[in-house]
């Protein structure tokens, strides 16, 4: 079910499937075999094999990294590395010589560095680097990092295995497979990727917390760890499991050099400055270049000498210690030496002689180490401790011996050394051979570089000894001698005498002679060291740790790809939601804009129609009134005529003498009165007409005003509806976005849990293999002890019997029969002692087995506890993030609602202003319409929303 959910989370829409892309720096139309010739295999990395290739035209050498890809998505995973290599042009960074994609394989051609990787050189020389060498490498690495960081690139996998050396004494930073190319210089990343031992604390925290991303300062921490690795061969906490070291990095103090007096104060100061757990106060690469430790470093002569020493011709000789020689040496030891040896102490030294000659090399003889005894367990423990700590006096430890090396013939000076660079140089995963032509036994698991040392001082191997053949010079009774011998052997047994004697027979002495040229002078260095069975175990542990790192890197790569896919899906979902929100918003706006346009168009048509109707109405009404007034005017004139007739008739009734004069007076008065009355009548008709027209105009204007107000109300209601819908959309969008982001956060943590469970399964698998390996080693060792015990007991019984008989011969007492009884009694005691010894060995083996089982169970419990803590921390962090997200959403909704109130008020105020403006507009028109001087002017009405009205 969980896997189905995981597939559902990473599933992208069908139309988002990418077509075949054409990459700028990758050629798809050329077979790389036609351009490059494969001349050898360099190694096998985590994602593919690395070959040594030669350009068929120019003859340039390259390291060809060949990676099989199943699909285009996997091909895209390597594009960042190719792009970084193609864009970077720096003296201390490897260059990209070409990239091809042919028949499902990606070929990345990288600049070839004959000196190999720094960690391979340290294994070759069996020592850490000297401070001048570290100083030179550090300065060049800082210059390369300063350039990378200026190009907005975070390397994210700095370690000695990714620092290559050239024959000119320069370094080349390599392996950008997990690097990040940012858009901004201060851009942060939250990917949990890199190699655990070199990870910065802020990168480790990203395994369970993505809200504390890191920046380019993570490379500075990795640089400091790399310097410690160069000084001590191994990085800090190398004895821990790769997954368990993460907890150590996060919780412990920054690591330091194990030896204080061996290194300069400037070196310690530099490491203290670089290994600052707070990335904010951690300096940049440019600032560290001003540190006194690297500021004084000039030139690259130390690295040239280092490469020359690593590429030297090597002669290995093996000297095996025989049993007879051991017994002879054992007889020569004094009882005093025997007594001292009860506290087991192992020191492995080397004899070194260096002689510079003008034209040739003189053979050197190594001083044979003194043959010693020690317990096998203590020896193994001491060897492991020696790998962890370098001596304070700068002398190299004798580590990483090779138990499967056979005696080699001397190399002639005219033979060209056969060297293979390392796959670690390009993937940081494998160490391959960097030695001269050398014969090894067929059982050798892999070629490991041989070692050399820089100091001409002699080293001697002093092993504390304890021998069983002590003898007795006292003339005591036979039974006393028997009891002393039994007690002595019992004490020897308790201190691991028997197993140690057998272990002593398997020790070998390796004498190695290196010949190389320094500044035109040939130098010969001869080293000698004792190797044992633990050498092979150390090599196996190193190989298994590389396997674990490789498995971890594969998991990180897959996790990074899944994270990128999920991030791409989330980005697409957010973008799709934003587009949908915008479309919905635009759709609603468009709908209401269309409604408003329709309403305004209808309003305009309605107003125009009303104005036309009003014009027709005014014209008809004016025509009707004028017709009535003309009729009234005619009636008024007829009345005046009638009155004139009546006046004439009345004057005709007067006497003739008065008639003419009276007629004239009466007619003049009547004419004047008629003119006055007629003028008044016409004026009254005009007033009536104007009044009627004014009433009609006011009625029309009122109708238009009502219609305009009706349309304005409808328009404002539409605007209110639009704003309400927009606000609802905004709130719904906030809710939907919150739900999407919340679901994406859950998907993100689901993916993290899934990847964390995969890591935990891999950790448990590795722990199971480790426990199984420890149990197998214990059973094998116990089986060997069980097989050796009868042989040792037989030899010891023979020796003790001989000693007992000698003691009887030295101090004879009693008759021959009594002596035979004593011998018989001694034999019975020997049988009892051997039986008790076998029983004690069985009990010891059972106890060891129980302890080993308890230790394995404890390891599993500790691992499960740590895994449970990580899971709990991840779940707790998810809960906190979800809670924080909900609180943020609630706060956002609260702020949005608080902002809605002033928006609503401003919107209503704007609508009210439009109403007031409309009322003001019609009020002014009414005042204009009521002006008596303008009453005769034709009136034209406009819509309030029309441009003429405004």
From Swiss-Prot:
Cystine pairings recorded for this chain: none
Annotated signal sequence range: none
Membrane topology (UniProt): Peripheral membrane protein
Variant or mutagenesis effect after changing residue 486 to A: Decreased phosphorylation by plk1/plx1
Residues where ATP binds: 42-50, 65
Regions of compositional bias (Acidic residues) in chain numbering: 319-331
UniProt modified residues of type Phosphoserine: 482, 486, 490
Highest rank taxon of the organism: Eukaryota
Region ranges (Disordered): 319-478
Active site (catalytic residues): 157 (proton acceptor)
Residue stretches of biased makeup (Low complexity): 433-445
Keywords on record: ATP-binding, Cell cycle, Cell membrane, Coiled coil, Kinase, Membrane, Nucleotide-binding, Phosphoprotein, Serine/threonine-protein kinase, Transferase
EC number: 2.7.11.1
Stretches with biased composition (Basic and acidic residues): 347-356, 416-432
GO molecular function: ATP binding; protein homodimerization activity; protein serine kinase activity; protein serine/threonine kinase activity
Entry-linked PANTHER family: NON-SPECIFIC SERINE_THREONINE PROTEIN KINASE (PTHR46538:SF2), PROTEIN KINASE DOMAIN-CONTAINING PROTEIN (PTHR46538)
Similarity-based family: Belongs to the protein kinase superfamily. STE Ser/Thr protein kinase family. STE20 subfamily.
Protein role: May act as a polo kinase kinase by mediating phosphorylation of plk1/plx1 and subsequent activation of plk1/plx1 during oocyte maturation.
Protein name: Serine/threonine-protein kinase 10-A
Organism of origin: Xenopus laevis
């Amino acid at each position: 079910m969980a896997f189905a959910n995981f597939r559902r989370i990473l599933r992208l829409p069908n139309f988002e499937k990418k077509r075949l892309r054409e990459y700028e720096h990758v050629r798809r139309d050329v077979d790389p075999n036609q351009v490059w010739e494969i001349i050898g295999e360099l190694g096998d990395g985590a994602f593919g094999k690395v070959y040594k290739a030669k350009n068929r035209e120019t003859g340039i050498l390259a390291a060809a990294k060949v990676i099989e890809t199943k699909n285009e998505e996997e091909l895209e995973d390597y594009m960042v590395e190719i792009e970084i290599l193609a864009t970077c042009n720096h003296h201390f960074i490897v260059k990209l010589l070409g990239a091809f994609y042919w028949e499902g394989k990606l070929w990345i051609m990288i600049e070839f560095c004959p000196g190999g990787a720094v960690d391979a050189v340290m294994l070759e020389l069996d020592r850490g680097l000297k401070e001048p060498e570290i100083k030179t490498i550090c300065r060049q690495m800082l210059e390369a990092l300063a350039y990378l960081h200026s190009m907005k690139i975070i390397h994210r996998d700095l370690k000695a295995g990714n620092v290559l050396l050239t024959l000119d004494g320069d370094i080349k930073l390599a392996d950008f497979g997990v690097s990040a190319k940012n858009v901004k210089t201060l851009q942060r990343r939250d990917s949990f990727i890199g190699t655990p031992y070199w990870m910065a604390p802020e990168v480790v925290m990203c395994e369970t917390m993505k809200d504390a991303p890191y920046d380019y300062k993570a490379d500075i921490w990795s640089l400091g760890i790399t310097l410690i690795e160069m000084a001590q061969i191994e990085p800090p906490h190398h004895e821990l499991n790769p997954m368990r070291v993460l907890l150590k990095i996060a919780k412990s103090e920054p690591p330091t050099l194990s030896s204080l007096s061996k290194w300069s104060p400037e070196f310690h100061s530099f490491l203290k400055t670089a290994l600052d757990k707070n990335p904010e106060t951690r300096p940049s690469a440019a600032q560290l270049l001003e540190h006194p430790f690297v500021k004084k470093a000039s030139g690259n002569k130390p690295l040239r000498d280092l490469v020359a020493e690593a590429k030297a011709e090597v002669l290995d000789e093996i000297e095996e210690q025989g049993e007879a020689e051991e017994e002879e040496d054992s007889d020569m030891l004094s009882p005093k030496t025997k007594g001292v040896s009860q506290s087991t102490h192992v020191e492995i030294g080397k004899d070194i002689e260096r002689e510079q000659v003008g034209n040739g090399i003189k053979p050197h003889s190594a001083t044979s180490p003194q043959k010693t005894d020690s317990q096998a367990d203590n020896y193994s423990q001491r060897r492991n401790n020696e790998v962890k700590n370098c001596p304070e006096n700068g002398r190299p430890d004798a580590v990483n011996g090779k138990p499967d090396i056979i005696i080699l013939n001397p190399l002639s000076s005219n033979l060209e050394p056969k060297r293979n660079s390392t796959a670690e140089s390009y993937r940081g995963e494998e160490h391959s051979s960097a030695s001269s032509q050398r014969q090894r036994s067929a059982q050798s698991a892999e070629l490991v570089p041989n070692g050399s040392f820089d100091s001409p001082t002699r080293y001697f191997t002093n092993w504390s000894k304890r021998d069983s053949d002590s003898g007795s010079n006292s003339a005591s009774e036979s039974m006393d001698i028997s009891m002393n011998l039994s007690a002595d052997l019992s004490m020897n047994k308790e201190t691991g005498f028997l197993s140690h004697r057998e272990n002593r027979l398997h020790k070998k002495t390796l004498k190695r002679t290196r010949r190389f040229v320094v500044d035109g002078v040939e130098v010969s260095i001869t080293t000698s060291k004792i190797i044992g069975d633990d050498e092979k175990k150390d090599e196996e542990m190193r190989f298994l740790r590389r396997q674990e790192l490789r498995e971890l890197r594969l998991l990180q790569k897959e996790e990074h790809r899944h994270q990128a896919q999920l991030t791409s899906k989330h980005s697409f979902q957010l973008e799709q939601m934003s587009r949908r929100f915008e479309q919905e918003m635009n759709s609603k706006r468009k709908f209401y804009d269309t409604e408003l346009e329709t309403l305004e168009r209808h309003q305009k048509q309605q107003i125009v129609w009303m104005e036309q109707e009003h014009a027709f109405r005014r014209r008809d009404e004016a025509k009707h009134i004028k017709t009535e007034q003309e009729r009234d005017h005619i009636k008024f004139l007829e009345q005046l005529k009638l009155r004139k007739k009546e006046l004439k008739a009345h004057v005709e009734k007067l006497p003739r003498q008065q008639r003419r004069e009276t007629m004239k007076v009466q007619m003049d008065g009547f004419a004047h009165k008629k003119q006055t009355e007629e003028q008044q009548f016409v004026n009254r008709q005009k007033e009536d007409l104007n009044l009627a027209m004014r009433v009609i105009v006011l009625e029309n204007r009122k109708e238009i005003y009502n219609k305009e107000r009706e349309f304005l109300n409808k328009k404002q209601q539409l605007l209110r509806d639009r704003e309400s819908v927009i606000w609802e959309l905004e709130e719904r969008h906030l809710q939907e976005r919150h739900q999407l982001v919340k679901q994406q956060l859950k998907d993100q943590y689901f993916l993290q849990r899934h990847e964390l469970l995969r890591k935990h399964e891999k950790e448990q698998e590795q722990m199971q293999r480790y426990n199984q390996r420890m149990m197998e080693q214990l059973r094998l060792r116990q089986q060997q002890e069980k097989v050796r015990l009868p042989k040792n007991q037989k030899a010891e019984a023979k020796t003790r019997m001989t000693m007992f008989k000698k003691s009887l011969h030295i101090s004879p007492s009693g008759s021959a029969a009594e002596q035979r009884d004593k011998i018989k009694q001694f034999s019975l005691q020997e049988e009892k002692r051997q039986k008790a010894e076998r029983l004690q060995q069985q009990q010891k083996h059972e106890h060891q087995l129980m302890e080993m089982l308890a230790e394995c169970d404890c390891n599993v419990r500790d691992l499960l506890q740590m895994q449970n803590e990580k899971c709990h921390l991840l779940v707790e962090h998810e809960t906190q993030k979800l809670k924080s997200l909900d609180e943020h959403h609630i706060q956002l909704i609260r702020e949005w609602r608080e902002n809605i109130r002033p928006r609503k008020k401003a919107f209503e105020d704007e609508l009210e202003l439009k109403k007031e403006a409309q009322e003001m507009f019609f009020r002014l028109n009414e005042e204009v319409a009521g002006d008596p001087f303008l009453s005769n002017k034709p009136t034209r009405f406009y819509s309030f929303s029309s441009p003429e009205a405004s």
